[in-house]
From Swiss-Prot:
This is Tyrosine recombinase XerC. Its main location: cytoplasm. The gene is xerC. It comes from Neisseria meningitidis serogroup C / serotype 2a (strain ATCC 700532 / DSM 15464 / FAM18). The keyword DNA-binding applies. One of its GO terms (molecular function) is tyrosine-based site-specific recombinase activity. PROSITE patterns: CB (PS51900), TYR_RECOMBINASE (PS51898). InterPro entries: CB, DNA_brk_join_enz, Integrase-like_cat_sf, Integrase_catalytic, Integrase_recombinase_N, Integrase_SAM-like_N, Recomb_XerC, Tyrosine_recombinase_XerC/XerD. The keyword Iron-sulfur does not apply. The active site is at 155, 179, 246, 249, 272, 281 (o-(3'-phospho-dna)-tyrosine intermediate). Belongs to the 'phage' integrase family. XerC subfamily. Site-specific tyrosine recombinase, which acts by catalyzing the cutting and rejoining of the recombining DNA molecules. The XerC-XerD complex is essential to convert dimers of the bacterial chromosome into monomers to permit their segregation at cell division. It also contributes to the segregational stability of plasmids. One of its GO terms (cellular component) is cytoplasm. Keywords: Cell cycle, Cell division, Chromosome partition, Cytoplasm, DNA integration, DNA recombination, DNA-binding. The lineage of its organism: Bacteria, Pseudomonadati, Pseudomonadota, Betaproteobacteria, Neisseriales.
Length: 305
């Protein structure tokens, strides 16, 4: 079986998405997904796969998905891989290198709706109000990092990409580059402004001096380092619960939505392109909503009666 016809333009495709401004993380994910697809197609019996792009069919791609599913990959991961494959096929079709897109009518595996985990507001306030050792630059940095994470609801990739000149302390907002390199402005809380003012004079800088959050050597903190610092902080000062940047973002969204009830505003602040993505946060804390109902509705039955 020959897959050269389908894989021949792989490098050109990756070069193209780099020119389009896709992040290194995104390009690396596309590379992995497509290399995995080529390997899966190469392992299939010759009667299951065509030899050139024009012969590839819907069946070939559904068979590849089925094999990945048998390996235990969840629906979310399978849907992402299918999306990567589809984008490559569309790119080939647009350039006349593939007759039709064989993935066009393949529906991604249905993903179970998962309500994001949010941290209790009281717990977060207590943790963020813990004393900070002003003589320890890393402790001051971490406090600013965590205040920003919860106070503005940024993704870990967005925090990683922040430069010092993205922060406007006098105006109390931060310029964020999100998914798809979309730009947005997000307000800063008073606590975040205070923490950043304490941190910036202590910030270590490398030669370019751009990164907002840096390590001892002055280089930009990686996403993994940010995740690790947050987990360590929670483990050392909290009650043993696991905490991730994603949970901090979920907490920001859920708490803000509970207080404001303005889902459109929360959508803008989070940088969601679709309202349906934001709507999942309406299910974050049904108990809280039920208590409000009990307290406010004249015909509600008190749950403690």
């Amino acid at each position: 079986m020959v897959l050269d016809g389908f894989a021949a333009h792989f490098d050109a495709y990756l070069e193209n998405i780099v020119r389009e401004g896709k992040s290194e993380h995104t390009v690396a994910a596309y590379r992995r997904d497509l290399e995995e697809l080529f390997a899966l197609l190469a392992q299939m019996p010759s009667e299951d796969v065509g030899g050139v792009p024009q012969d590839l069919s819907r069946r070939d791609f559904t068979a590849a998905l089925r094999r990945l599913s048998q390996r235990g990959l969840n629906a979310r991961t399978l849907a992402r891989k299918l999306s990567s494959w589809r984008q490559y096929c569309v790119w080939l079709v647009e350039r006349g290198l593939l007759h039709t897109d064989p993935t066009a009518d393949i529906k991604p595996p249905k993903q179970p709706e998962r309500v994001p985990k949010a941290l209790p507001q009281e717990w977060l306030n207590r943790m963020l109000d813990l004393p900070v050792d002003g003589g320890d630059p890393l402790a001051v940095r971490d406090h600013a990092l965590f205040e920003l994470m919860y106070g503005s609801g940024l993704r870990v990739s967005e925090i990683h990409g922040l430069n010092a000149d993205d922060v406007y302390l006098d105006e109390a907002w931060v310029h964020v580059t999100g998914k798809g390199r979309k730009q947005r402005q997000v307000p800063l809380t008073g606590k975040s402004v205070e923490a950043l003012k304490n941190y910036l004079p202590l910030r270590q800088t490398a030669s370019d001096g751009k990164a907002l959050f840096t390590g001892r050597n002055g280089t930009r903190l990686s996403q993994r380092q940010i995740q690790k610092r947050l987990a360590q902080w929670a483990a050392q000062n909290g009650d043993g619960r696991h905490v991730s940047p994603h949970m901090m973002r979920h907490s920001y969204a859920g708490h803000l939505l509970q207080a404001s009830r303005d889902i459109r505003a929360v959508q803008e602040l989070l940088g969601h392109s679709s309202l349906s993505t934001t709507q999942i946060y309406t299910k974050l804390d049904f108990d809280h909503i039920a208590r409000l109902y009990d307290e406010a509705h004249p015909r509600a039955k008190r749950r403690d009666e």
